[in-house]
Structure formats: C-alpha cells, structure tokens
C-alpha cells in the first residue's frame, strides 16, 4: 500500500517500511478500555469505549500520549480481533466506540466498520489533519466526529506539529465532517448520538491563535456547533 491516507501523502509502502506516522499497514492497538474523562456527552455515566491506535500523523511536540503516538506501543490486530475488542467494550456498557487517532489506519477502520456495523455510535477522535478522500471513505460509517482544531497560525503548526498547511487541511476536513453528520444531537440522557464536536487546546502564549480558530468556527460552521475548549496543556 502506497500510503496517501493523510495530507502528508508520504507515498510509503507501509507493508515494507513506516511513514511519518511510524506505523505499519497492520493495525496496532495500544489500549482499549472504558474512559470517563472525555466530554460529558461522550463519556456519560458508563464510559466511552476508547480504542487507542498506535502512531500518529501529527506527533505534536506537546503530545500527552507520546508513548502511543510514537508507534512502538501496542500489538498488531487482525480485523476479527479488533471487532472482538469492540464487542468487549460494548458488553461492558460503553456508550460508544471511541476510535482515538485512527487517521493513518482509516482504510482498515472503514473495512472493519463495513463488516461490524456497531450497535452504539462510532466516534472518530482525531487530530484534524485529515484528507478529504479519506473522510469520504468513512461517510455513513462514523456517527460522531471529534476532531481537534489546533491551529489557525501556520507558524505554530509548523513549529509544534511539522504541518504548516494544518489550518487549510483541518478547515476543509471539518467542513466535510459537518456535511456528513451535522450539528451534535443528544439522546434523552444527554449522550451524543450523532454530529460534530470541535476540540481546541489553548496553547500558552498563543491566545491569538485560539481567537482565530474560534472566529473561523463562528463564521464557517452552523449555529449550534459544539466547541470543546481545553486548557490541559502539558509541557
């Protein structure tokens, strides 16, 4: 597979060597468990069924999960093993299947979800640096998009994530996510069923970047779009 799943478009044959994401073509999972520290409408009372994929197409310098994003953690999984992992999380009462950093495995994710057809909402929890072609491949398979929108400032994006085109790529990706799933919808218990939640982490000394991101959201996305503003930056 010559990989073009994300905007980096490495063109690397991941059956032979790793690309920027430091990941082979075979899915590697680092952790799968109920998680209670997502947004309240995602975690609810039972927890979110989080599935952490190894590797990352951004690898931000301030990453809180660097052991996972570095690509070395975890174990390889077949499609059947991934689906069995999903089953175990649902049996534990997970409100959803929360796929964390799945971008560089999106082709495998699409193939698995085509076969699996989850009984609970599927959350695509990503860094926002996405390819339109990849997102269109996921249409109808993802119920909730939970992207970061990290940067409107290309200099920050280059310095911290080696992605100077982040704003352009994330902007078009989030518009596509909104087209697919629309404004967030909750059930009677306040649990997310479908829609878009945009996350943004405020970076130290970069309030102007945050203002630009929020302005873009206000001017570009529908009224009622849910924004999760975060402050847990860790140096």
Feature roles, as predicted:
Residues 84-235:
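Conserved AdoMet/S-adenosylmethionine-binding subsite of the radical SAM
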Residues 2-61, 65-72:
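N-terminal [4Fe-4S]-dependent radical SAM core
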Residues 34-37, 81-83, 126:
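Short acidic (Asp/Glu) patches
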Residues 54, 60-95:
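Glycine-rich active-site/cofactor-binding loop and its immediate structural neighborhood
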Residues 36, 68-71, 78, 157, ...:
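Hydrophobic alpha-helical segments
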């Amino acid at each position: 597979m010559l990989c073009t799943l994300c905007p980096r478009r490495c063109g690397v044959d991941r059956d032979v060597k790793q690309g920027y994401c430091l990941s082979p073509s075979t899915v590697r999972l680092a952790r799968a468990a109920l998680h209670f520290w997502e947004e309240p409408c995602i975690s609810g009372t039972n927890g979110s069924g989080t599935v952490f994929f190894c590797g990352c197409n951004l690898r931000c310098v301030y990453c809180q999960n660097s052991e996972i994003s570095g690509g070395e953690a975890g174990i390889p999984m077949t499609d059947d093993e991934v689906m069995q992992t999903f089953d175990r999380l649902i049996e534990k009462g997970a409100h959803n299947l929360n796929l964390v950093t799945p971008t560089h495995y999106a082709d495998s994710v699409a193939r698995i979800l085509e076969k699996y057809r989850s009984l609970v909402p599927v959350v695509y929890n990503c860094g926002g640096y996405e390819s339109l072609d990849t997102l269109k491949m996921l249409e109808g398979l993802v119920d909730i998009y939970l992207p970061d929108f990290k940067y409107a400032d290309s200099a920050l994006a280059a310095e911290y994530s080696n992605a100077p085109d982040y704003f352009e790529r994330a902007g078009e990706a989030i518009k596509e996510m909104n087209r697919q799933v629309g404004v967030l919808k909750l059930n009677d218990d306040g649990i997310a069923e479908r829609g878009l939640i945009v996350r943004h982490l405020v970076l130290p000394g970069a309030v102007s970047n945050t203002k630009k991101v929020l302005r873009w959201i206000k001017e570009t996305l529908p009224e009622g779009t849910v924004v999760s503003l975060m402050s847990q930056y860790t140096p």
